[in-house]
């Protein structure tokens, strides 16, 4: 878990599968945790599986919960804070795939983590 109270699991990506243009993740944010505001070139969608929070995209912040799907345009600053009492889980998909080196900064593969 990162200091912000979020754990991200890399699912399909060019690094882990034969996907060439897509990166998918499952993220878990503990109560009070947050994904800090950041931006990247790929477009992205978040699909909230459970829990509730505050999603910021650009200058707009909205309350999100189970079943909500949020589109994040390319280059748009965004982040998600779990301000509820329960764990927040979401699935994300980004396309095109992240630029070379981006994934290595964020996710260590299990074999790399075991040898580090």
Please annotate each region the language model reported.
Residues 33, 41-42, 60, 76-77, ...:
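A generic "binding-loop/recognition-motif" signal
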Residues 24-27, 71, 85-102:
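A short hydrophobic beta-strand segment most commonly corresponding to one strand
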Residues 21, 26-30, 39-55, 93:
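Short, conserved beta-strand element in jelly-roll/cupin
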Residues 1-22, 105-116:
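A short, N-terminal "cap"/entry segment at the start of jelly-roll beta-barrel domains
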Residues 59-74:
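Short acidic-glycine-tyrosine-enriched beta hairpin
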Residues 8-13, 25-40, 74:
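Conserved short histidine dyad/triad with adjacent acidic residue
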Residues 8-9, 55-57, 80, 90:
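Short hydrophobic/aromatic-rich beta-strand segments that constitute the beta-sheet cores
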């Amino acid at each position: 878990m990162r200091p912000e109270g979020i754990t991200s699991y890399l699912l399909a990506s060019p690094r882990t599968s034969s996907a060439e243009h897509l990166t998918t993740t499952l993220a878990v944010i503990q109560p009070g945790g947050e994904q800090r505001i950041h931006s990247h070139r790929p477009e992205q969608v978040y699909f909230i599986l459970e829990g509730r929070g505050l999603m910021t995209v650009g200058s707009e912040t909205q309350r999100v919960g189970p079943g909500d799907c949020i589109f994040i345009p390319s280059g748009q600053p965004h982040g998600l804070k779990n301000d509820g009492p329960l764990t927040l889980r979401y699935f994300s998909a980004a396309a095109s795939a992240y630029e070379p080196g981006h994934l290595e900064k964020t996710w260590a593969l299990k074999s790399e983590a075991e040898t580090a």
